[in-house]
Amino acid sequence: MKYLNHVAVTATVLAMAAGGAYAQEKKTLAIVVKGLDNPFFEQINLGCQDWASNNPDSEYECLYTGPASSADEAGQVQLVDDLVTRGVAAIAISPSNAPAMANRLKEIAPEIPVMTVDADLSEADRTLRATFLGTDNYLMGVMMAEQAQRLKPEGGSICLQLGNVAADNINARAAGFRDTIAAAEGTDRLNGEGGWTEIEGCPVFTNDQIDLANQQMADVFTSNPDLDAFVLIGGWAQFAPQAYAQVTDQVMDRLESNELIIIAGDTLPPQVQAFNEGRSHAQIGQRPFEMGQRAPDVMIQLINGEAVEDPIYTGLDVCTHEEPGFCAQ
């Protein structure tokens, strides 16, 4: 399967390189996401397109791309390699596997501006990029923890659902969550701190696969009928509304009584719908459209040698049933 993804990625790059006169006219600002199968990243694409429509006379074009599958870490690294070889003007990367991406950047030593968007490189490797544009992911985890504490002041049993084990943004959110609950930095696992205990078998890792995320939720609910809280550090399961509805149908009575609470990251349309149906208690929303919309301008600043802030944070939206805010119907 990975071979097929690599072929698709290479074919995409070759097709772009063969674009003829248009490719000569416009210099390319590339945004490389973790995978084209994730609707969160489609919002970044819409932001990229919006920038292009608002800057028709620019000498630059905004190119949104990524491997076909979010699970194809090697494909993403290869795509970045191919784009740098092709000669894009600048590149913004959301690294799926931060150490692997950093290792390749060290090897190819691109002379073009490199930045990260949505997800960053590991702290030790951040000199390899000029800036990060996206969410304050540690703060996002803090805000998730605050909702858990508000909804269940006494704590309880909890399962965290994470993405890729090497994704810096997801790990930062998990750290923010655990540190806030425990009131101590560097908390690796909750074992009674603040009244909360992570159950055996958790955290679970989705590897950014939506179907797996829903199956994991179903399995956890079945194996732990008295679970107090399930936290989707990213939105994965909710990106498939039918599957997510089926999974939460089995625990709707517990959700309605707040015996079981669900807190999730992101506020894409299917997630807002699920929230308004009572299938989650709080959503902490990122702003991916803004990331895609702002990334080209930041890359142009870097090309021009201008100073840019590092990091550049986009905001967060909090939805609760008491104050639905962004998620209001």
Predicted regions and their residues:
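Bacterial N-terminal signal peptides that target proteins for export
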Residues: 1-9
